[in-house]
């Protein structure tokens, strides 16, 4: 018999009754019923019940051991009595009569329990992540991640893509978030950067003559944590294709996502084909560029209705309305509760009216609306008895942010929200540039390597804020899974694009020397995308936080509490790297959000 096991803990069934077995695993739980010990033994594959009767070697040994001790046991498979069968356990029809026990790894006092999902704070869980990963939910999430990545690889190869690796040590670049830098011992005073994304390398592969590239790529960004973004390191399905237009990129990715979410979605519906929603339409209808289409409500811009209104709360402001069917009969508590939710998201309040059976409007602001206002709103919003309407007024960005949150919450509270589905969409026609309202500076709104839709003519003739890029996002259930773009592969066009964003020719020629050199030696039209693997798994696992799907994530302050990283270097190491430290100074705007190349 094998030194440690003849079977795994999850594979024994009623057909194995009478078999002598050897198992190894962790002591998951123990119950003492009149001196008879019932032990749940756990390994990677499942759980099985052990029985150790009084006076047996197994009973004496197991009685002294703590939970999570690793043991090897010998015993015989026996059938459980009919009253003791556990139908929720694959091994629930059998148990193991223990004859021998060997301790392989004793466990001391545990910092938290493993066999329950109790309220242990995240910092504690990350400090003892190896224990946290023993929990059933976490173990299942990591195994789901493994299966998803394996499936992605298989499907990408079937779609005609080739997996290729790109460098981890590369050069820093001016676009995107902050780099993680690595000092070069052999080149004093110089630094490598860990790649924020393999952006330039995957484009260079297309210029090298390869046609369809993919990689499960590690990416590194020195940015703040969010629920859907882990600081430090993350993984993306990096994709690039030659001789393609936008729809050519959409087709294989849409097929991949549909098949992947169907395979691992546990019966949840996957909507296909994915609708294409222009960026500006998304901002107006949903309040953001990552709409949760499970919420079956849309915002309506009614700013013109109140442009010259006597109602000061709305007059001259950007005003967005949210009509909600079948809600007028809700209690005042419903309306007040949604108002409180809006305040929590930055609003000063939430104006509303409801439509009565006779078509008249009632509510806190009804008395401020003229007959013309009522008629226009009724027509514009297609109001009928039973409707309620919620209003947000103020600056465009502020109203968009608040009302996007209210839209989803109102849908959930009023019964207009779909459960058990994955609602995908493409967001297209992104603006190429944006203006910093404080400095007045024009900068790239997203990916600086995107092709402007009108080419060089647009860059030379149009207002930069009116230029659209061949850039797109794929969104699912309000989570942005990826950005992508058709690339700007023409040198002069690229230089002009950067010039508009304030980069002089010399800087661009220096920072992107490799790219420009390649573009000048025969570059094909190409484009790509990079869906986030961590976010895909987060959605499939139905987890609210991305760190629940990563084996060893950093905490919100980009610290590894288990390994103690980041660490200080001793003076000898610093001298070897030609580095001298100075007292840290808080950087102005250190926590400001950063643009990113692709996600």
Curated annotation (Swiss-Prot):
Broadest EC class assigned to this enzyme: ligase
Segments for region (Aspartate): 199-202
InterPro entries in alphabetical order: Aa-tRNA-synt_II, aa-tRNA-synth_II, aa-tRNA-synth_II/BPL/LPL, Asp-tRNA-ligase_1, Asp-tRNA-ligase_1_N, Asp/Asn-tRNA-synth_IIb, AspRS_core, GAD-like_sf
Pfam families: GAD (PF02938), tRNA-synt_2 (PF00152), tRNA_anti-codon (PF01336)
HAMAP family named among the record's database cross-references: Asp_tRNA_synth_type1
UniProt EC number: 6.1.1.12
Reaction catalysis annotation: tRNA(Asp) + L-aspartate + ATP = L-aspartyl-tRNA(Asp) + AMP + diphosphate
Residues given in the record as ATP binding sites: 221-223, 480, 532-535
GO cellular component terms given for this protein: cytoplasm
Location (main, coarse): cytoplasm
Record localization: Cytoplasm
Function as written in the Swiss-Prot or TrEMBL entry: Catalyzes the attachment of L-aspartate to tRNA(Asp) in a two-step reaction: L-aspartate is first activated by ATP to form Asp-AMP and then transferred to the acceptor end of tRNA(Asp).
Molecular-function GO terms, alphabetical: aspartate-tRNA ligase activity; ATP binding; nucleic acid binding
Organism encoding this protein: Streptomyces griseus subsp. griseus (strain JCM 4626 / CBS 651.72 / NBRC 13350 / KCC S-0626 / ISP 5235)
Listed NCBIfam families: aspS_bact, PRK00476.1
Signal peptide region: none
Positions contributing to L-aspartate binding: 175, 221, 446, 487
The protein, known as: Aspartate--tRNA ligase
Gene Ontology annotations of biological process type: aspartyl-tRNA aminoacylation
Family: Belongs to the class-II aminoacyl-tRNA synthetase family. Type 1 subfamily.
Keywords of the record: Aminoacyl-tRNA synthetase, ATP-binding, Cytoplasm, Ligase, Nucleotide-binding, Protein biosynthesis
Domain of life per record: Bacteria
Assembly behavior: Homodimer.
């Amino acid at each position: 018999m094998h030194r440690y096991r003849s079977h795994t803990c999850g594979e024994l069934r009623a057909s194995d009754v009478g078999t002598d077995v050897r198992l190894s695993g962790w002591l998951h739980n123990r119950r003492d019923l009149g001196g008879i010990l019932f032990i749940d033994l756990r390994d990677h594959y499942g759980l099985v019940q052990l029985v150790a009767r009084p006076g047996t070697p197994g009973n004496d040994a197991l009685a002294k051991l703590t939970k999570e001790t690793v043991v090897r046991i010998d015993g015989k498979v026996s059938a459980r009595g009919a009253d003791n069968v556990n139908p929720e356990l694959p091994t629930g029809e059998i148990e193991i009569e223990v004859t021998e026990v060997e301790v392989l790894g004793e466990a001391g006092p545990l910092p938290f329990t493993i066999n329950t999902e109790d309220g242990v704070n995240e910092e504690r869980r990350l400090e003892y992540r190896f224990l946290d990963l023993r929990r059933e939910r976490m173990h299942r999430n990591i195994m789901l991640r493994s299966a998803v990545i394996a499936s992605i690889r298989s499907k990408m190869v079937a779609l005609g893509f080739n997996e290729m690796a790109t460098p981890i040590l590369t050069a820093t670049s001016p676009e995107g978030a902050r780099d993680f830098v690595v000092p070069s011992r052999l080149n004093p005073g110089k630094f490598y950067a860990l790649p924020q994304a393999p952006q330039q390398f995957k484009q260079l592969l297309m210029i090298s003559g390869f046609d369809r590239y993919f990689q499960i790529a590690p990416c590194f960004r020195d940015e703040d944590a969010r629920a859907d973004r882990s600081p430090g390191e993350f993984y993306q399905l990096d994709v690039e294709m030659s001789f393609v237009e936008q729809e050519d990129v959409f087709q294989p990715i849409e097929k991949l996502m549909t098949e992947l979410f169907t395979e691992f979605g546990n019966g949840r519906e996957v909507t296909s084909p994915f609708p294409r929603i222009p960026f500006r339409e998304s901002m107006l209808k949903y309040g953001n560029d990552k709409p949760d289409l499970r919420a079956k409500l849309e915002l309506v811009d009614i700013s013109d209705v109140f442009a010259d209104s006597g109602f000061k709360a709305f007059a001259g402001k950007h005003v967005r309305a949210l009509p909600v069917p079948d809600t007028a009969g809700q209690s005042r508590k419903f309306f007040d509760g949604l108002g409180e939710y809006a305040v929590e998201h930055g609003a000063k309040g939430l104006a509303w009216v409801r439509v009565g059976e006779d078509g008249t409007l009632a509510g806190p602001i009804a008395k401020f609306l003229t007959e013309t206002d009522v008629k226009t709103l009724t027509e514009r919003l297609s109001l009928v008895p039973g409707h309620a309407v919620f209003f947000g007024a103020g600056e465009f960005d502020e109203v968009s942010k608040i009302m996007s949150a209210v839209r989803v919450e109102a849908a959930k509270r009023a019964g207009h929200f779909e459960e058990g589905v994955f609602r995908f969409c493409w967001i297209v026609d992104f603006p190429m540039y944006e203006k910093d309202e404080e400095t007045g500076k024009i900068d790239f709104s997203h990916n600086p390597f995107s092709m402007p839709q009108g080419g060089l003519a647009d860059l030379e003739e149009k207002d930069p804020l009116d230029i659209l890029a061949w850039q797109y996002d794929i969104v699912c259930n309000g989570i942005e899974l990826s950005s992508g773009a058709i690339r700007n592969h023409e040198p002069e066009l690229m230089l002009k694009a950067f010039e508009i964003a304030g980069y002089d020719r010399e800087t661009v020629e220096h920072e992107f020397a490799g790219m420009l050199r390649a573009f000048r030696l025969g570059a094909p039209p190409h484009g790509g995308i990079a869906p986030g693997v961590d976010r895909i798994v987060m959605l499939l696992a139905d987890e609210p936080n991305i760190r629940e799907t990563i084996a060893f994530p950093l905490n919100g302050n980009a610290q590894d509490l288990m390994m103690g990283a980041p660490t200080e270097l001793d003076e000898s190491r610093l001298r070897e790297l030609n580095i001298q430290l100075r007292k840290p100074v808080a950087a102005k705007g250190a926590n400001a959000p950063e643009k990113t190349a692709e996600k």
